[in-house]
Amino acid sequence: MIKNHAPYLKAVLFPNNLAEVGSSVNQSNCFTVQDYHYHCFRERDEQGNPYGNIRSGYLEFSIVVSGLDTYQHFYKCMDQNENVPFSFIFNASFSKTGRINDFEDGLITYGYVVDIQESCDNHDNHGQEQLLLHVKMLLSNLIFIGNEQIHLLEITKD
């Protein structure tokens, strides 16, 4: 079984824009997030205060996938070299039918998938082989979503 690197971070990845599909997100279309981090660049003045536009950065994340058909989407995104959305949903609850009920907050990212690495692990409890997929993408947009607010962080290209 793949070790959970972040036992206190309850996050799932939905390979689309959560704001566009709303409550029609099905749990079977989500992936368990093991870890993620992103980095953006911004100029700072002598006092250390940020100013100006945010420059392109990157996002790296690792997810657990089971089966070949579940991770082909990520390779397709890399092959097509298109600006694609991914939604990180934190502390989500799902209904008995598998649809999303509620979530604490989220992060919608847009960018270009530039690298994918795989780590194979033992089988899960159902005898299915699991993969840990490490994805790196160049960011174009970050959108923070929460219970009461949506905040767009626009990234510019230099």
Role assignments for model-derived ranges:
Residues 62-68, 76-80, 89:
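Family-specific signature for flavin-dependent thymidylate synthase
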Residues 143-158:
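Intrinsically disordered, low-complexity terminal/linker regions enriched in Pro/Ser/Gly
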Residues 9-13, 84-100:
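Short conserved beta-strand and strand-loop elements enriched in small hydrophobics
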Residues 1-42:
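Polar/acidic, low-complexity leader/linker segments enriched in S/T/G and N/D
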Residues 50-71, 113, 128-142:
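Oligomerization/assembly interface segments of phage tail-like spikes and tubes
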Residues 52-54, 79-83, 102-104, 126-128:
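Edge/loop elements at the starts and ends of beta-strands within beta-rich repeat scaffolds
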Residues 96-130, 134, 138:
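Short beta-strand and beta-hairpin "edge-sheet" elements
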Residues 34-50, 114-123:
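Short amphipathic beta-strand and strand-loop transition segments with alternating hydrophobic
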